[in-house]
């Protein structure tokens, strides 16, 4: 299990635990269940790269945007 921290820059920091072999889509589904927003409306970013099929590691901090 890995833990990822998602910050939406509006004061919400969400810690999500997922398996290391889960995809970004699985991460979005778990995240949407925790914050109550549809998974299709979530965009995960770090700096200027948007995460679609990238590899994430334990303890990564991602920026959370709503489309």
From Swiss-Prot:
Disulfide bonding pattern of the chain: none
Residues of the Ubiquitin-like domain: 2-67
InterPro entries hit by this protein: Hub1/Ubl5, Ubiquitin-like_dom, Ubiquitin-like_domsf
Keyword Cytoplasm: yes
A GO term, aspect molecular function: protein tag activity
Keyword vocabulary terms for this entry: Cytoplasm, Ubl conjugation pathway
Location in the cell: Cytoplasm
GO BP field: mRNA splicing, via spliceosome; protein modification process
Pfam family, one: ubiquitin
Main location: cytoplasm
GO cellular component: cytoplasm; nucleus
Entry protein name: Ubiquitin-like protein 5
Organism the protein comes from: Dictyostelium discoideum
């Amino acid at each position: 299990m890995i833990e990822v921290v998602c910050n939406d820059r509006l004061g919400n920091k969400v810690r999500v635990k997922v398996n290391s072999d889960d995809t970004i889509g699985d991460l979005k589904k778990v995240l949407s269940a925790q914050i109550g927003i549809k998974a299709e409306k979530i965009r995960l970013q770090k700096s200027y790269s948007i995460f679609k099929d990238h590899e994430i590691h334990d303890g990564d901090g991602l920026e959370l945007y709503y489309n």
